Regions:
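An alpha-beta-alpha
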Residues: 220-261, 357-369
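Amphipathic helical "hinge" segments at domain boundaries
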Residues: 42, 66, 89, 101, ...
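Flexible loop/hinge segments that line or gate small-molecule binding clefts
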Residues: 176-219, 319-328
Length: 369
């Protein structure tokens, strides 16, 4: 249902106010949808920004006065004022006393404002951030926030900062139950599609031309292991260390099980490492996020049995990071390319070309395999 509409053409005239040249012809067609989840002030902002992008509005063209806009759209003057002030603060429009608001000249020196909303800090997130920041350079101001996999925090940050940033880059890692996922989608839909980039996890139920750079938890583990299928088949067993509390436990286990079944490899899943599961001639894939503790327990148990990693038994870790190049003379990993993830997200912002890209996933061979 359309609540109000504005189709306004002002008299053609060019005026000079100091250094400001203003063209008083301004074709503008706005429609406010009453039942939209997007509030009216945000609808005004979105439509003016879209008119600038598609060339309907150009630098120097006047906007209607607040009173004219409010009357034509059937809104309060305060609603229109809120839209104009936000657009002015963002550098989209300017104002001159006694004249009104007009479309600002493009400011090539203005830095883009980017919110990085991660679930938690980790070595992997640091790799993503470093790559993102080095690619985007001095062209953006970046602020990091954490939602800690809590929907309430996601909602809080989106509500509070929706009008403060040009781009929102979000890792949507939340519990996978249907209720939580519906809440997440509802919150994310408040963000204008053109400002949104989803990282690390693809949201199939979120439609639109937003950007996403993701890994596929349902297939990637099998893809990585397939790169060493010939070496894995002769070994006695693949031991997978993965906690049942892991967010994507079911996806990873299914992917690994499918690989082992297809390649006739014996596979056993464990929630942690104990000395009784450590044997010569076997492989240990550590999927748990707390790699350090599992790795320490595995190496301790192996040393007690005079077993050397890479020689008497093999170790593969899930997810790569710089420290894994050094541990045990190099820890073999299967991993998404997190540097690529950060770089591609930054390039989407720099080029203003959101798209959907699956990151490369590979095995990085080092000393433990």
């Amino acid at each position: 249902m359309t609540f109000g509409g504005l189709d306004l053409f002002m008299t053609q005239k060019t005026c000079n106010f100091g250094f400001v040249k203003i063209d008083l012809i301004m074709p503008l067609n706005l429609n406010i949808v009453e039942q939209s989840i997007v509030p009216p002030f945000r609808q005004i902002i979105n439509q003016i920004e879209e008119s600038i992008r598609n060339g309907s509005l150009k630098s120097g063209e006047m906007l209607p006065s607040m009173s004219e806009m409010a009357e034509s759209l059937g809104l309060s003057k305060e609603t229109v004022k809120k839209s104009y002030l936000i657009l002015r603060d963002q550098g989209v429009i300017n104002s001159t006393r006694g004249v009104g608001y007009f479309i600002a000249s493009p400011d090539s020196n203005r830095k883009k404002r980017v919110m990085l909303l991660f679930d938690r800090l980790s070595i992997v997130k640091e790799v993503i951030f470093d790559s993102f920041a080095s690619t985007i350079g001095e062209q953006a101001e970046i602020n990091i926030y954490l939602h800690n996999q809590q929907v309430e925090l996601l909602d809080y940050y989106v509500r509070k900062y929706l009008d403060s940033y040009d781009w929102f880059v979000i890792t949507p890692h939340f519990p996978l139950d249907s209720k939580t996922q519906r809440q997440v989608l509802t919150i994310l839909r408040r963000i204008p599609i053109r400002k949104l980039i989803i990282l690390d996890h693809k949201l199939d139920n979120l439609v639109g031309n937003y950007g996403t750079v993701y890994q596929d938890y349902a297939t990637d583990a099998a893809l990585g292991l397939s790169m060493a299928a010939e070496e894995l088949r002769p070994l006695r067993k693949l031991n997978v260390i993965i906690s049942q509390s892991s967010l994507y436990h079911a996806y990873a286990c299914q992917s690994i099980s499918d690989f082992c079944k297809a390649n006739k490899i014996s596979c056993v899943f464990h929630s942690n490492v104990s000395p009784r599961i450590v044997h010569a001639g076997e492989v240990y894939l550590i999927v748990n996020g707390q790699l350090d503790m599992d790795l320490i327990n595995l190496v301790r148990a192996a040393r007690a049995k005079n077993l050397k990693p890479g020689k008497d038994f093999r170790i593969i870790a899930y997810n790569d990071s710089p420290i894994r190049e050094i541990v045990l003379d190099g820890l073999t990993t299967i991993s998404t390319d997190f540097e690529q993830m950060g770089r591609l997200a930054a390039e989407m912002i720099l080029d203003n070309t959101p798209r959907k890209v699956k990151c490369d996933f590979r095995m990085i061979r080092r000393g433990t395999f």
